[in-house]
Amino acid sequence: MALSKDEKAATLKEFGLHETDTGSPEAQVALLSARINQLTEHLKDHKHDHHSRRGLLLLVGRRKGLLKYLASTDIERYRSLIERLGLRR
């Protein structure tokens, strides 16, 4: 259920600050969002997969923390990111 190398590379290319950027909040949030979307689709078919549901909730919490950090340090980058990802806030 992990992202493939190609999916990860495409996400990092779109949201990273440079080609090999994996540490910026934008890149991390984009990767987490991709995994969250993938898990959400999985759970639509497998409603009783509670182990995956718990993993999903952990990922959502991690993304929330990164978004909170980004909002407190640079509000413009935060607003740009949530608009590009289509997140509600």
UniProtKB/Swiss-Prot annotation:
Database matches in InterPro entries: Ribosomal_uS15, Ribosomal_uS15_bac-type, uS15_NS1_RNA-bd_sf
UniProt key word RNA-binding: yes
Keyword rRNA-binding: yes
Gene3D superfamilies per record: 6.10.250.3130, S15/NS1, RNA-binding (1.10.287.10)
CDD domains: Ribosomal_S15p_S13e (cd00353)
GO biological process entries: translation
GO molecular function, one term: rRNA binding
Any one GO CC term of the record: cytosolic small ribosomal subunit
Keywords assigned: Ribonucleoprotein, Ribosomal protein, RNA-binding, rRNA-binding
Domain of life: Bacteria
PROSITE patterns: RIBOSOMAL_S15 (PS00362)
Family statement: Belongs to the universal ribosomal protein uS15 family.
Alphabetized PANTHER family for the sequence: RIBOSOMAL PROTEIN S15, BACTERIAL AND ORGANELLAR, SMALL RIBOSOMAL SUBUNIT PROTEIN US15M
Cited function: One of the primary rRNA binding proteins, it binds directly to 16S rRNA where it helps nucleate assembly of the platform of the 30S subunit by binding and bridging several RNA helices of the 16S rRNA.
Subunit annotation: Part of the 30S ribosomal subunit. Forms a bridge to the 50S subunit in the 70S ribosome, contacting the 23S rRNA.
Name under which the protein is recorded: Small ribosomal subunit protein uS15
Gene name as annotated: rpsO
